[in-house]
Each structure stands twice: as structure tokens, then as C-alpha cells.
Amino acid sequence: MLNALQRPQHREWLLEQAEALLEFARKARQPLGFAYLDKNGEPDFGQPIQAWISCRMTHIYSIGALMGMEGCREMAEHGIRSLLDSFQDPQHGGFFEAINHQPDAAGHAVPTPEGERKTAYAHAFVLLAASSGLIAGIERADELFNAISGVIDRHFWEEGAGKMRESFSRDFGECEAYRGVNANMHSVEACLAAFDAQLSLGVAANDERAARWLARANSILGFVLDLAGRHDYRIPEHFDAHWQVLWDYNENDKTHQFRPYGATVGHALEWARLACHALAMNQKYGVDAGEHYARDAYGLFRQSLGNWHGDGAAGFVYTTDFQGVPIVRERMHWVLCESIGAAVALDGVNAADAPVGDLGLAEAYVATGLGGEFSYWYEQFIAYADRYLIEAPGRWHHQLDTENLPAEGIWAGKPDIYHAFQALMLPLLPFGPFITRAVKISSAVD
């Protein structure tokens, strides 16, 4: 166990901060979904209602429902309804990426011109929302799960490649000639959630209804972790339709929110966490995959630490080149959140008799071993969040400048609570199950 978690006051602080996030985000609820929030936690009506935000909120409030938090079940039910009734395309199937706040004269949701495209990123989050809804027993979550499963099977999952296609035109007639690691990363998370959702319904782990989701997660993970290992644990993120690296992709748009140029530090940390979760599931259910996941997760974690204070200021830079030189030096809250999750997950792997092995520990940690290392970094990351990111309970700055002052540019406002909430909850939960199922079976939040 991480040293900090042996202190009751720290566990209480984590839970109080998580509950404050659930309270802060309540104003996001709008008739057709969940709105993007501004820096004061008010709906930003200059932004459309976006699927990824509505899905993340549905996922988080499903967890809140399992925690017994007042009003969270109603929020999750609203999210499931909005995804089915507002975001689902009644003409071509699939789910819109973004819709207008105002419906048409007949009361139907209207996609924005850009938001009518069908993207793997948005569909991964629909699967996440449906899975958490199933685990939490949210009304109509089964309907949403069946709908999104069918769309992924028919259009997004590319069996020969063992990964997700990126995006399609509204009618699924045109497939984008690009493949991306970001959408596939969130697809891994969603597949792990879907696997656990099936288990929560009593489906056996080796039943195809459950097993296919874990197999898909392992397929994507195997590719990305092998790729990372061959590039000094800095992950190329952009590919053509044949999965050949596009090294110069977005060289002229280095601060892109979802497809930035270079290596994204926070994604390395997120992949490390997901690899640990998949490893635990594989081991528990006898799946012959992922024998190198612990090694690669640790490699990603250690390489990312080279960017901690990497430009002389506290915190993680956003992106680097493939030699580790910072490109975009602004600090994103989600990167720090994923560093917390990675430290927690690696500690869980190490404590579960699946040690990451002799991987060249920093000399300072030899005396205490890996557990000491993860405890040290966990406390460093929590201290940074408390000092720089948490404006007040429930209010996390989403972007800081190079001097760690609140800033905007890449991200404006405080759009959602997904990364911060998970970072606060993961330390409190048993390691192994996906976060929503872990809450369901845990007494840590009672």
C-alpha cells in the first residue's frame, strides 16, 4: 500500500475532494446532455454539447450513484437518456460527436456541422458510459450498451489490424485515412470497462460476450506497448491508414487538444495505468496475454518522470520531441491526474506478487524498493495538485502556464471532472477491477 494511504486523514481528503467534484459539475446538466463548463463552473453556451463530455459525466455520476451520493443516479440516468435520444443518429446509426444546445422545431437534437462525424474517440466514451451505467444499474444502460457494441462491431473495430478505425462521415461511407493512438487508448479503457460490465451481469469471463472486450484491449495494448518499447518509451501517436507512423503530423498545430505534435507525456502515463489494469484482469481470469505489461508500464512511467520539472519549473510539460526535448511546456491538469493513477496502478501490480522486476531502480529507492518509489512519486504528485491545480475543493484548473499560473489557450474553463475524479478515487479502491466495478465491490467509500 502507498504510504500516504495508511493515514486516515489522507483517505478522508481524497474522498472529500472527489465528492466536491461531483457537486461542482452539477450545473453541466442541460436538456440534451451535459455542457462544457467555464472557469466558474457555469455552462459555456458558446461550446456545443459534446459527446465526450456527456459520456464522461455519465460515467462519473454512475460511480457517484454507487457511492450513494445524493442526486448522482438522476444525473447518470439523464446522461444515458441523452446519449440514446439526443446523440444517437436515427438515420445512419452511431453517435454524433457534438450537437447544438437547441433542438429543431420537432424537438430533435441537431448535430453541428463538424459534430455529425462519427469518431472512435466519442464512441469509446459512449461504451465507457454504457459500461459504467450497466455496473451501476442505471436505467436504459443495457439499451445503450447494445447499441454502441453493434456500432463498434460493424464500423470501428478493424479485425485485421486489431485496432480501432479513427472516424467516418455521418453515413459511414467515408473512413478517414488516419489512425490515432489517442482514440485507441480510450478504446482500451472502454473495453476494460465493458469486460467488467459483463462480469457484473453474471457473464463468465471466458464467455464471448465478455472475453471479446478484454481481447480487444489486449490487442491494442500489445501494439502500443511494443511500439513504445522500440522508441525509448515515447509513443508515436499518429499513423496513416496502414498504421505507418506519421512523424510530422500536426507539426504546424503543436497544441492540438486531441492530436498534438510529438510525444504526449500524459498519454504515456495513461497507457502505463491501463496496462496495469489489463495485466491484473489477465492474471485473475487466466488470459494468456500481457507478460510484458508490467515492464512496459514501468518503462513508460520512468521515461515520463524525465519530464517532471523537465524545463526547470514544477510539473509535467505537455509534449516533447522523441529525444525528450519539451515542445509545448504548458501544464495540463489531466497529465498530473494520470501520473497519480499510474503510480497507484504500478504500486498495485508490485504489491500483487507481479513485480515489475529489476529494471534499474534509481539509486535513491534501492533501500525501499519499488513500493517506496511509487509512494514517493504519489506524494509528489498529490502535493503538486494541492498547491497548483486545486483552486478550491471541486475546482481544478485545467491548464497552467510555464510558471504554473492559471492559463487558457489549449483548454479553456473547467470542462469536466473525469480525470480529476478518477485520480482521487483510484487510490481508495482495490486494485484490479475497472474503477466503476471496484467502487461497487469496495467498502472503501462506505
Where are these regions (language model features)?
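Glycan-recognition and catalytic cores of secretory/periplasmic carbohydrate-active enzymes
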Residues: 1-446
